[in-house]
Amino acid sequence: MTDKTQAAGLSSDATEVRSQKLDLLRQQIGDVYPAHFHRTLTNAELAEKYAGLEPDTESGETVTVAGRVFSSRNSGMFMDLHDASGKIQIFSHKDTAPEEARALLPMIDLGDIIGVTGEVRRTKRGELTVNAKEITMLCKSLLPMPEKYHGLADIETRYRKRYLDIMVNEESKLRFQQRSRIVSSLRRFLEDEGFMEVETPMLQPIYGGATAEPFKTHHNTLKLDMYLRIAPELYLKRILVSGLTDKVFEINRNFRNEGVSTRHNPEFTMMECYWAYADYEDVMGLVERMFETLALAVHGKTEFEFGDKQLSFKGPFPRVSMPAAVKDATGIDFLALKSDEEARQAARDAGVEIEKDATWGEVLAFLFEEKVEATLIQPAHVIHFPKDISPFAKEVPGEPRLVERFETYCNGWEIGNAFSELNDPVEQRARMVEQMEQAHARGEKEKTLDEDFLDAMDQGMPPAGGLGIGVDRLIMLLTNSPSIRDIILFPARRQKAD
């Protein structure tokens, strides 16, 4: 407890002291939480405007700034005031500051938000400073800030109380500023490529476009069970059918009622786009241009660090077929295997446990995940996926078990997934029926055919290339963030016990 706190008869408990100061402030000045405050410059604008001011010089100009008090020295004579753009020093001298400003100083705690009007000067040590002539209390903080020099180290508290994390950890603040810049750059890139942005339903009566467990809800007025979408694909394809645009995209949230990990959050951001009269080869080029553009937006170059790795987003990226990659890793030539049982036996011979009813394509994909995926550090396109696991992609000519699909990998993570989209309505129906039967076999009895989507396909959809990008994972790479929770402002967490 400070001498001034003791003199004022305040409690020794930090939180109680703040509440008592709030009561005193209400008595002294009335409104402690005013609705409006006019500042003339942000801290960054002030620093830029007076960058040429020499040490030990007064500007002769008065400004008004506002922000949160982060440090206080010499009984409040010096304070560091932070706004979203940066820091400025505030000086209040007992001999020069007006009485009203001096009287307010003992009531100011770290974390309070104040407004300051005064003359700009640069100290002998070169610190840009505002000499306070007027101080306005804008928001009295009732809780102490985390300790200045150690920041907010506890990882759980950082995720649960993100506002504190950003308040005191400059690295976290920068990361979320970068996230905003990346999403803006992604949107601008797609618009420059001629794509039109749309918004499709989050609540869907039939979930589809991916294989995942949905979140279920109920619409009371419509008396209808609905699902938070797992993907926007089937609605975006309806737009291609409509002729509204030949290039469409959406950046929005998907929801999957599945596991949580350093790479998975049940609510996540996806970019999906569809490009009429293009195929997966065209989309590979689009991905390479996109990655290069985003790296330049964040780093000013295409090479950057992720952990102990040096990554390069400079295209073109290598391309490898899934069967070839698995053959290189295991020696198994899947194209020479003719049946599901041959594939399962080959996996068992390689020491890999496989489900007893796994298909040829499922075995191939599983071995890829187990033996190849983690080795793909630099960006690479893995092409020619099994048709068994790709119900919306066109077959590879001459190899009916494979489809024109690729996934883009980096750091061993899947970042993008793309197809030459299937537009044969008869084949599409057959594959979706098969997909529904497989879902029912897994116990997903609510899975049904989206007949409206199939009607749209019967109307005719142009050939197209489609792409989905996991925006969160891409941001993780570009911001050197090892966990998806580091780049989602408010990640899903288990409820904290009382």
Swiss-Prot record:
Cofactor(s) of this protein: Mg(2+)
Tagged with keyword ATP-binding: yes
GO term, biological process aspect, one: lysyl-tRNA aminoacylation
Localization in the cell: Cytoplasm
EC id: 6.1.1.6
Keywords recorded for this protein, A-Z: Aminoacyl-tRNA synthetase, ATP-binding, Cytoplasm, Ligase, Magnesium, Metal-binding, Nucleotide-binding, Protein biosynthesis
Ranges annotated as spanning the membrane: none
Main location: cytoplasm
Gene Ontology CC annotations of this record: cytosol
Catalytic activity reported: tRNA(Lys) + L-lysine + ATP = L-lysyl-tRNA(Lys) + AMP + diphosphate
Cofactor binding summary note: Binds 3 Mg(2+) ions per subunit.
Keyword flag Protein biosynthesis: yes
Binding site residues for Mg(2+) 1: 407, 414
Description of how the protein assembles with itself and partners: Homodimer.
PANTHER family cross-referenced by the UniProt entry: LYSINE--TRNA LIGASE, CHLOROPLASTIC_MITOCHONDRIAL (PTHR42918:SF15), LYSYL-TRNA SYNTHETASE (PTHR42918)
Name under which the protein is recorded: Lysine--tRNA ligase
Source species of the chain: Rhizobium meliloti (strain 1021) (Ensifer meliloti)
Lineage: Bacteria, Pseudomonadati, Pseudomonadota, Alphaproteobacteria, Hyphomicrobiales
Gene field: lysS
